[in-house]
Design a protein with these regions (language model features):
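Membrane-interface helix caps and helix-loop-helix hairpins in membrane proteins
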Residues: 20-26, 73, 116-126
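Extracytoplasmic catalytic/substrate-binding loops of multi-pass membrane glycan-assembly enzymes
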Residues: 23-37, 47-63, 69-70
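Glycine- and acidic
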Residues: 18-23, 44-46, 71-76
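Transmembrane signal-anchor helices characteristic of membrane glycosylation enzymes that use polyprenol
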Residues: 1-28
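Short aromatic-rich membrane-water interface segments that cap or initiate transmembrane helices
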Residues: 37-48, 71, 117-118, 163
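Membrane-embedded helix bundles of polyisoprenyl
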Residues: 6-15, 56, 60-65, 78-166
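Acidic/histidine-rich, surface-exposed loop or edge segments in extracytoplasmic proteins
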Residues: 19, 34, 41
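Hydrophobic alpha-helical transmembrane segments
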Residues: 22-32, 75-80, 103
């Protein structure tokens, strides 16, 4: 009951934040558009007005500047980081749900089909947000135990709101 309510409430919040901003998913991007926007941010300090969802570009540009690496390298590393976050989130969430020794491995195997989706090897904003969902669900699962998890859940909701076009 409570888990379903949390999922429905989170989805309601995500949808309502975008409706409150006055737009839904407007444009379709490919990976090279995201890389180009990140290059625009690095070279000129801003992104063009046509980039309605700049989260991926901003993250790539700022991370590349922080670690002094190229945008191309960041565009190669970000999908790997998101896949790692996905697998780690699935493992943590599975262990939080059940202590049965076969539950975590079976949940990991059950989560593998999403890795064959067409958008997975890209750096699109949808990929980043979808890959963070298991970690978000784990944080929601743990919200009743500590206020730290509630703060993390709030941060993740803001992250999803800014990063995923609905």
């Amino acid at each position: 009951g409570l888990g379903l309510f949390e999922i429905l409430f989170s989805n309601f919040l995500l949808v309502s934040f975008y409706l409150a901003k006055g737009f839904l998913y407007i444009d379709r991007f490919d990976s090279m558009s995201i890389v180009g926007y990140a290059k625009d941010i690095v070279l000129s300090g801003h992104f063009p007005g046509t980039n309605y969802y700049p989260m991926g570009s901003i993250m790539m540009a700022s991370t590349g500047e922080l670690v002094d690496q190229s945008i191309i390298l960041m565009s190669q590393l970000f999908p790997a980081l998101m896949l790692t976050a996905y697998m780690l989130g699935m493992l943590c969430w599975a262990r939080a749900i059940s202590d049965h020794p076969l539950f975590a491995p079976s949940m990991m195997v059950a989560s593998l089909p999403i890795l064959f989706a067409g958008y997975i090897p890209t750096i699109m904003h949808q990929t980043m947000m979808v890959m963070m969902l298991p970690l978000f669900f784990y944080i929601l699962w743990r919200c009743g135990e500590s206020s730290r998890y509630k703060v993390l859940a709030a941060v993740m909701i803001v992250f999803f709101t800014l990063g995923h076009p609905l």
